[in-house]
Amino acid sequence: MAHKKAGGSTRNGRDSESKRLGVKLFGGQEVKAGNILVRQRGTKFHGGENVGMGKDHTLFAKTAGKVKFEVKGPKNRKYVSIVAA
C-alpha cells in the first residue's frame, strides 16, 4: 500500500502589518494646528519651531502655517518647522 509520511511543519508564514510610517506632509504644504507631519521610530527628524513631539516620536504642528524642512547643526540633523503663512 502506498503511504505518504507526514510532512514537517515550516517555520515561515508570518508577516507583521505595516506601520504606515514616514513623512505625511511635505515642504511648502499648508497645515493646521494638530496636523501630523512625520510618523517615525526614533528621531529621524527633529522638531523645529512650532512643532511638537508625541511620546512615539510623532511630529505635529502646534500652529497653522507652512511646513519647512531644513538640515542644520554640526551633526547635520533634519529639522521640521512650521513657518507662519
UniProtKB/Swiss-Prot annotation:
SUPFAM superfamilies: Ribosomal L27 protein-like. Keywords: Ribonucleoprotein, Ribosomal protein. This is Large ribosomal subunit protein bL27. Pfam families: Ribosomal_L27. GO terms for biological process: translation. GO terms for molecular function: structural constituent of ribosome. Residues 1-22 are annotated as: Disordered. The keyword Ribonucleoprotein applies. InterPro entries: Ribosomal_bL27, Ribosomal_bL27_CS. One of its GO terms (cellular component) is cytosolic large ribosomal subunit. It comes from the Bacteria. Belongs to the bacterial ribosomal protein bL27 family.
